[in-house]
Amino acid sequence: MAAAEPLTAFSRWYLYAIHGYFCEVMFTAAWEFVVNFNWKFPGVTSVWALFIYGTSILIVEKMYLYLKDKCHILVRCFIYTLWTYLWEFTTGLILRQFNACPWDYSQFDFDFMGLITLEYAIPWFCASFIMEQLVIRNTLRLRFDETAEPGAPTVPVALANGHVKTD
């Protein structure tokens, strides 16, 4: 029996894109409730968010693999937050050239060109922690088994310590 293969980069990008898209919708719904007490929770985003989040998180995955044994998680999250600001600014600037940028932070006190705002530093930092610890680490553990039958029980796997893992 062939060993299960890790997910391809495109498969991981797809999962990261959907995760980011979902989080964006949930964040905007929560923000609308906190600011305007809107019980409808209207979460919104743009289809551009799929590309933006998928690509950004895939790059953060590469950073994680490089940095995980080199620096503390708080330092990594700070680096991821800086990356997030750079990526948000860059993609926003490009999209703005086509009148397609879906966000505008001009109304915030600490915005830069309406494309990024320091008010989101703590949420981005917290999101980067969740992204690394829950999303990236678990996505890297996923495997694709081409021979498995959909819905069939999994075959126990012998572990290196001699025990058999069963789910």
UniProtKB/Swiss-Prot annotation:
Residues 36-40, 94-109 are extracellular. Keywords: Membrane, Transmembrane, Transmembrane helix. It is found in: Membrane. It comes from the Eukaryota. The chain crosses the membrane at residues 15-35, 41-61, 73-93, 110-130. One of its GO terms (cellular component) is membrane. Residues 1-14, 62-72, 131-167 are cytoplasmic. It is a multi-pass membrane protein. PANTHER family: TRANSMEMBRANE PROTEIN 229 FAMILY MEMBER (PTHR31746), TRANSMEMBRANE PROTEIN 229B (PTHR31746:SF3). This is Transmembrane protein 229B. The lineage of its organism: Eukaryota, Metazoa, Chordata, Craniata, Vertebrata. The gene is TMEM229B.
